[in-house]
């Protein structure tokens, strides 16, 4: 193994990106990726710690020092194999995981210098493998047991990937016409190209995972029939119901949930209209309510659809924005106007109920709340009207209650999430497991992957003891 650099000797390798002026005009991916030399240089910054704290921050338990060490030996395909031992979706995770809050936050190098760019190295390795490697056939003895996975998002795919390696017969049911869940309908092409998701799904198919699309458990398929057909079931149905702010005018024409807006553009390709059947209205001035990753995706999508002015309306300050730092930075580069310390009071409309603006309450930060974030407090008598012709609400989502309503034996919380055993993913119904946003509420892709893997282990333990 080549010697690692001394602490701080090599600066963090910045990944090149397309210019804001260029990328505002299309949906092509923004980061250009590391070259082999950049990846090699970045890998040398890793100290190969005896106690790898970075791994403590990875829900998928990727062996981070080991895959980076293989990059340092320029064994890029071996590095990809090492990641895929525990994570079936490295191309997605390398692009959309909040590494600054997880693995990179715990990087020892980061205590004094910039942390090792773990996410960018994962992205490099995944892309290198896709371009240079042939998929290896999975060789595993089948155990004769069948598992049904409901929902083909990150949690379901991760669960399927682990179970197929353990010898189970795995069938994934998906309500939509495309596999990938939020990776396909929620995250824009410029952040996660759909061909990458399709590639990783194809690898799962080659491993033996079976997929059935346009299948809605609880509607087109009876849940009890599924329980009889399969030895275990995993619920990875996500959190697809949008939350709204409940202010006057929310029913006006020109108000969208981020879910609808992004699904039209991402899943149905509306930005290509009239080449595709699904249209999208190209608004001139757009306000996005919220400050998370979905809000960033929505505002940057509006920019690419030709909006002259796009606002983020957020009730706290820049410091409290929950979105990934990279997404915030890219949105600012692309000209999005961030209106901090503003909360929506009313959506304004004309005589035909078309949106003409949003009235906001000026806020200030008060004492910290239960999560440690300072609570926004209204500044009495101070409001601001912002002229827009569209409002996109991106303040969160909740799980679809369809299965829970059909199967009252499945215990849920007040928020509609499944009650599970945190260690195994087991629900209140024997043989039924759950994970991802359906169990924890709207969260990140990597947390969903971690949940899917945990449930796969729980299912294996459960069926091994039957």
Q: Where are the language model's segments positioned?
A:
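Feature captures the FAD/FMN-dependent oxidoreductase FAD-binding
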Residues: 78, 141, 146-150, 198-247, ...
């Amino acid at each position: 193994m080549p010697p690692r650099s001394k602490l701080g000797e090599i600066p963090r390798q910045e990944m090149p990106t397309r210019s804001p002026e260029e990328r505002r005009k299309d949906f092509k991916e923004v980061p250009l990726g590391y070259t082999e030399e950049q990846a090699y240089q970045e890998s040398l910054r890793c100290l190969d710690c005896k106690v790898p704290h970075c791994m403590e921050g990875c829900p998928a338990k990727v062996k981070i020092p080991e895959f980076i060490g293989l990059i340092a030996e320029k064994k890029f395909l071996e590095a990809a194999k090492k990641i895929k031992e525990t994570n079936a979706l490295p191309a997605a995770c390398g692009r959309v995981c909040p590494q600054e809050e997880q693995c990179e936050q715990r990087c020892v190098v980061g205590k004094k210098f910039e942390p090792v760019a773990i996410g960018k190295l994962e992205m490099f390795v995944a892309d290198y493998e896709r371009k240079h490697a042939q998929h290896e056939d999975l060789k595993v003895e089948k155990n004769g047991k069948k598992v049904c996975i409901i929902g083909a998002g990150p949690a379901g795919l991760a669960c399927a990937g682990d179970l197929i390696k353990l010898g189970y017969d795995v069938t994934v049911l998906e309500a939509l016409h495309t596999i990938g869940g939020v990776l396909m309908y929620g995250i824009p092409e410029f952040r996660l190209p759909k061909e990458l998701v399709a590639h990783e799904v194809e690898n799962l198919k080659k491993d033996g995972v079976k997929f059935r699309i346009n299948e809605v458990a609880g509607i087109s398929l009876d849940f009890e029939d599924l329980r009889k057909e399969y030895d275990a079931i995993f619920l990875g149905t996500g959190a697809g119901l949008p939350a709204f702010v409940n202010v006057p005018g929310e029913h006006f024409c020109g108000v969208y949930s981020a879910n609808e807006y992004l699904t039209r553009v991402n899943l149905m390709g509306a930005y290509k209209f009239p080449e595709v059947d699904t249209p999208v209205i190209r608004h001139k001035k757009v306000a996005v309510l919220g400050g998370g990753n979905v809000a960033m995706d929505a505002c940057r999508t509006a920019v690419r659809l030709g909006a002259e002015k796009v606002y983020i309306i957020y009730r706290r300050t820049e410091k409290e924005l929950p979105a990934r730092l990279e997404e915030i930075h890219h949105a600012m580069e692309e000209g999005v106007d961030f209106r901090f310390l503003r909360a929506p009071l009313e959506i304004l409309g004309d005589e035909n109920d078309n949106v003409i603006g949003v009235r906001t309450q000026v806020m200030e930060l008060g004492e910290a709340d239960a999560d440690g974030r300072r609570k926004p407090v209204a500044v009495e008598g101070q409001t601001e009207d912002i002229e827009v012709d569209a409002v996109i609400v991106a303040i969160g989502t909740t799980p679809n209650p369809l299965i829970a309503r059909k199967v009252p034996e499945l215990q849920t919380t007040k928020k509609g999430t499944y009650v599970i055993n945190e260690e195994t993913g087991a629900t209140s119904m024997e043989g039924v497991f759950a994970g991802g946003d359906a169990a924890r509420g709207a969260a990140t892709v990597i947390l969903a992957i971690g949940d899917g893997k945990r449930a796969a282990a729980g299912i294996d333990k459960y069926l091994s003891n039957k």
